[in-house]
Amino acid sequence: MTTRIVGTGSYVPEQIVTNDDLAKIVETNDEWIRSRTGIGARRIATAESNSRMAAEAARRALLQAEIAPEEVDLILMATSSPDYCFPNGACEVQEQIGAVNAAGFDISAACTGFVYALNTAHAYIKSGIYRTVLVIGSDVLSKLIDWTDRGTCVLFGDGAGAAVVRAADRGVIGVKMCSDGRGGSVLTCGSRT
């Protein structure tokens, strides 16, 4: 037995901030940003909370997978920008989508969070503890980044993606993960609280 993704969903806010918009507030331009990042625009949440975006992505993933929220055993939410210290975002999503039988917790691993959450789902399912896991990656980094820092404000936007992971005979062949914390100081984002 292994695991496979049986449904995916996403949500992005309506507001778009282009590179030209950023050029009005920091010393930069479209060519500078694109040549270094490949980014032309990013989405910014104005009214959406992190958990609301995550819940909408989750609903879309469940719909595609044709799985009812009550069938979800575990919700893993990868985020670096939770709405609150507690409750965790996964529990907020659980309530919003009606996944009344699911446990839930957050994973904080920055850009790699979704991959860590997928691996965690894989391990739980392979162990036989859970059969259906909802994995979500969601962030509202626009509320945390320094909009006067050209080196970071050009990189981040807001949005959510979700995947329904289930036990399967064919799917994931193997997983190998490692970390290298030596470059941790290269890109940082502090708390606003």
Each model region followed by its residue ranges:
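Conserved beta-strand elements of the Class I
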Residues: 4, 73-76, 134, 173
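Flexible, glycine-rich active-site loops centered on histidine and acidic residues
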Residues: 126-160
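Phosphate/pyrophosphate-binding loops at sites that engage ATP/ADP/AMP, CoA/4′-phosphopantetheine
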Residues: 57-73
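Acidic, glycine-rich active-site loops and adjacent beta-strand->loop/helix elements
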Residues: 11, 78-83, 109-114, 137-142, ...
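Condensing-enzyme catalytic core mediating Claisen C-C bond formation in acyl metabolism
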Residues: 1-47, 149-193
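Conserved catalytic cysteine-centered active-site region
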Residues: 32-36, 40-52, 80-133
